[in-house]
A protein has these predicted regions:
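N-proximal low-complexity "stem/linker" segments adjacent to membrane-targeting elements
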Residues: 1-24
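Active-site-adjacent helix/loop segment of glycosyltransferases
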Residues: 5, 191-242
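Acidic donor-binding segment of Leloir-type glycosyltransferases
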Residues: 19-60
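Glycine-rich, basic loop-to-helix element that forms the pyrophosphate-binding segment
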Residues: 58-75
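Short aromatic/hydrophobic "clamp" motif used to bind/position activated sugar donors
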Residues: 80
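Conserved donor NDP-sugar-binding/catalytic core segment of glycosyltransferases
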Residues: 91-122
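Short, flexible, basic/aromatic active-site loop/helix in glycosyltransferases
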Residues: 130-156
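A short, conserved alpha-helix in the catalytic core of glycosyltransferases
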Residues: 156-207
């Protein structure tokens, strides 16, 4: 069974569409745990959606990693999936994702992410350094880190919008580092997986749709959170590279 964790921050309409996709395309063998990080406005009766959902409601807002770690403790599946509420599906991605996790040393797998027009999104990247971050800030557009072809490959890290882990692996690395409230918790987690000898995998044979919101580019609060997470990550590396 696959336990799917979805954290909603007033993403009720998006989450309902995703749940409908899961009901349409994923034929059994899934458990869905949805966390209301803040109360939905207007309120959503999750018992009326087309697929069974276990709902967790926070008394106060928590970070991305904390929400998914909490859902993991409530989950029962052999595999644990972190899934953003604004992702859409057009087919069942899980057979290909689980097939990729059967490879030796696979610690996490992600599908290829495309936007609603079919353009490939940069959801797999090399680990950031101060130099690469400055280059990205000063040069636009920056070429993608990886050329996407048809075959699965092993990037440095994959984005947290859609990740699938073997349960034992997620438990071994103790999940997300909850000191990252938002942003870079996925980078940090993939770095810790690699240090333990696991591979990060992306398979273009599975696809999901995500239209990037880029809140950190528009909102000062999100930008400040992004900057704090970047600094935490760069300063926490055991052998930091410039």
């Amino acid at each position: 069974m696959i336990s799917i964790s979805i954290a909603s921050h007033r993403h009720g309409p998006m989450a309902r569409r995703l749940l409908s996709d899961l009901d349409t395309y994923c034929a059994g063998g899934i458990e869905i745990i949805l966390t209301e990080n803040v109360p939905e406005d207007p309120a959503v009766d999750w018992s009326l959606v087309s697929v069974p959902v276990k709902v967790l409601r926070n008394s106060e807002p928590r970070g991305f990693g904390a929400n998914h770690n909490s859902a993991f403790r409530q989950s029962r599946g052999e595999f644990f999936c972190v899934l953003n509420p604004d992702v859409r599906l057009t087919s069942d991605p899980f057979p290909e994702l689980l097939s990729e996790l059967s490879a030796p040393h696979a610690g996490v797998v992600a599908p290829l992410i495309v936007d609603s027009g079919g353009a490939v999104q940069e959801s797999a990247r090399r680990f950031p350094t101060l130099v690469s971050l400055l280059r990205k800030a000063l040069i636009s557009p920056v070429p993608p880190d990886y050329a996407i072809r048809d075959e699965p490959f092993s990037p440095d890290w994959v984005a947290g919008m859609f990740m699938v882990f073997p349960r034992d692996v997620f438990r071994e690395i103790e999940g997300f580092d909850e000191r990252y409230f938002l942003y870079y918790e996925d980078v940090d987690l993939c770095a810790r997986l690699r240090r333990k000898g696991y591979e990060i995998r992306l398979t273009p044979r599975a696809r999901a749709i995500h239209d990037a919101q880029r809140d950190s580019h528009r909102d000062l609060e999100y930008f400040a959170r992004h900057l704090r997470s970047v600094l935490r990550y760069l300063l926490s590396r055991p052998q930091r590279r410039l």
